[in-house]
Amino acid sequence: MRTRVAELLGAEFPICAFSHCRDVVAAVSNAGGFGILGAVAHSPKRLESELTWIEEHTGGKPYGVDVLLPPKYIGAEQGGIDAQQARELIPEGHRTFVDDLLVRYGIPAVTDRQRSSSAGGLHISPKGYQPLLDVAFAHDIRLIASALGPPPPDLVERAHNHDVLVAALAGTAQHARRHAAAGVDLIVAQGTEAGGHTGEVATMVLVPEVVDAVSPTPVLAAGGIARGRQIAAALALGAEGVWCGSVWLTTEEAETPPVVKDKFLAATSSDTVRSRSLTGKPARMLRTAWTDEWDRPDSPDPLGMPLQSALVSDPQLRINQAAGQPGAKARELATYFVGQVVGSLDRVRSARSVVLDMVEEFIDTVGQLQGLVQR
C-alpha cells in the first residue's frame, strides 16, 4: 500500500487514525499506520504530557496533531473569547432548558474536583490554539492538521519551517480548493458519513471531486471507512490514503465511556444524526435522548461555537458520570461523535488488530478486483 501519502508521512500504511486518546495514537503508529492526536480540548500542559508520552511509546514512529481552526465563531472579530466570557454570553433560557433536562433525567451535580479535572474548553481562537502549536512544534511531530477552515498563512509557514506537513479537512471541492491555495500538503476529503463536524456531501461523491479539484495535491478519504474494502474503494476513487476516526472508538485502548462504547457496539448505521447540540456546528453523533431533546419544536436553537460547548461541557460530564450507574436514566442521554460506520463496529479489538485487519482485507480486495480484468 505504497502511496505518496505513506511516503510523505513516513508510515508503512497510509491509514491515518484520528483520536483524542494517546494510547490509540501510539498503537496505530506502532502498527504501521499514522496516529493523529486531537488536541482542541487540551491545555498546553496536558498536550505536553500527551506528546511526551506518545514519543516515549512509539520509538520514533511518526505521528501528528489535529487542531480546530474555524474561520467563523462567536468572538472571532475580537480575536476570540475565553471560557469565562463564553459562559457570560449564554442566554438564561438556554441554561434553564439544560437544567430542566438534567433534572428530568435524574442527573446529579458533579463535585468541584470532577469539574476542575475536566476544565479546558475548545481552543479555537489564535490566543487559544497558539500555545498548543508552541507545544506541538517543540515535539517531533510529522503533521499538523487543521479542521473547519483553511490553515492561517503563519501556521503553514511555521509548519514548513519545522519540516512538518500541513493537512486540512474539506467537505466540498470549494473548501478543498481554498486549502490548496493556502499551501497545505494534504487534503482530507471528509464525507457526510463521518463522525464529528461534517458537511452534506457523501464520501463516494466528494472524494473524486476533490481529487480532480486539487491535483496534484494528495488527498485522503474520510467518512465511512473502517475496513480494507473501504480503503480499496477510497484509493479507486483517487485518494492516496484514508483518515479514520470512528473505528478507534470501540478499541481496547479507547477512552470512550463504557456506556457509550456499549451503545456504539449495539448501534446500526441508521443510529446517527447531524446535530449542533454539542459544539454549535453540525456534527454527526449517536442519536440519543440528548439529540432528540434538542430537536424538539419547543427547544431552543443550539448556540454558536464556542457558546454551545461552554453551555453543555459540564452537563456532559455529569451525564457521563451518572450513566455509569446501573439502571440510571442518564444512560438514555449519553452520546458522542461517531459516523455511520458505527453499524459495522460489533466487537472490541485492539487498535493494532484493526490496522492489520484493514491491510489484510485491502490486499484480498485488490486481488479480487485484479481478477475481474484478467483475460
Curated annotation (Swiss-Prot):
InterPro entries reported in the protein's UniProt record: Aldolase_TIM, NMO
Alphabetical list of Gene3D superfamilies matching this protein: Aldolase class I (3.20.20.70)
Presence of the UniProt keyword Protein biosynthesis in the record: no
Positions bound to FMN: 190, 195, 224, 243-246
Name of one Pfam family that matches: NMO
GO molecular function term, any single one: nitronate monooxygenase activity
Keyword annotations of the record: Flavoprotein, FMN, Monooxygenase, Oxidoreductase
Statement: the UniProt record of this protein carries the keyword Oxidoreductase: yes
Cofactor: record remark: Binds 1 FMN per subunit.
Membrane-crossing residue ranges in chain numbering: none
Family: Belongs to the nitronate monooxygenase family.
Protein name: Putative monooxygenase Rv1533
Species for this entry: Mycobacterium tuberculosis (strain ATCC 25618 / H37Rv)
